[in-house]
Amino acid sequence: MELKVLNVQGQEVKTISLNDSVWNVAPHKQAIYDTVISQQAALRQGTKKTKTRAEVRGGGKKPWRQKGTGRARQGSIRAPHWRGGGVTFGPTPDINYKKSVNKKVRALAFKSALSIKASEQNLVIVDKFDFAKPSTKEMISVMKNLQIDDQKTLIITKENEELVIKSSSNIKGVKTLPSIKLNVFDILNATKLVMTEEAAMAVEGVYA
């Protein structure tokens, strides 16, 4: 697969050849679905909790005597059917939301996501980001040159590049990640995927 490499002025500087086994595979919807569900489930904290009737304060005394009042018999004002009472079968914090996915399935989902972006021409390869200092204005100018301004964009660099991160952090809809943290959800959640040439080669080296 041949792709153009652009500079930050939006000009083509060369063409690179990418491995079809990574960037041009038939998308596998089930693998993508399973991987995204697993990734999102792993983010859940599982901290929600409700109190049972045993944990709610008060309610030890019988509200009224068993017989003779004409009312229905009651044993506690903290029974589940009372306002302010305990909750029956409520959520507890010991729930494990983890969903495991086979390594090969995750790899297939990753390659499928990259292939979708490439086939839709939403993958942009740049030679490098050459910032002398953090500059939001300069990053906006670069995005206009690459014709990706006003679009939800994921920028991938080989390493954590502080100047790129700081330059893009105040731009709405732009997220920056190092190649090692690239994931299926973020790829598909963005409209445009922008990668440095080094980052693209690093990703290909892992999944080819």
Curated annotation (Swiss-Prot):
Organism, scientific name: Mesoplasma florum (strain ATCC 33453 / NBRC 100688 / NCTC 11704 / L1) (Acholeplasma florum)
Descriptive protein name: Large ribosomal subunit protein uL4
Function: One of the primary rRNA binding proteins, this protein initially binds near the 5'-end of the 23S rRNA. It is important during the early stages of 50S assembly. It makes multiple contacts with different domains of the 23S rRNA in the assembled 50S subunit and ribosome.
Stored Gene3D superfamilies: 3.40.1370.10
Molecular function terms from GO: rRNA binding; structural constituent of ribosome
Complex and partners: Part of the 50S ribosomal subunit.
NCBIfam families: rplD_bact
Family affiliation: Belongs to the universal ribosomal protein uL4 family.
Regions of compositional bias (Basic residues) in chain numbering: 59-70
Superkingdom of origin: Bacteria
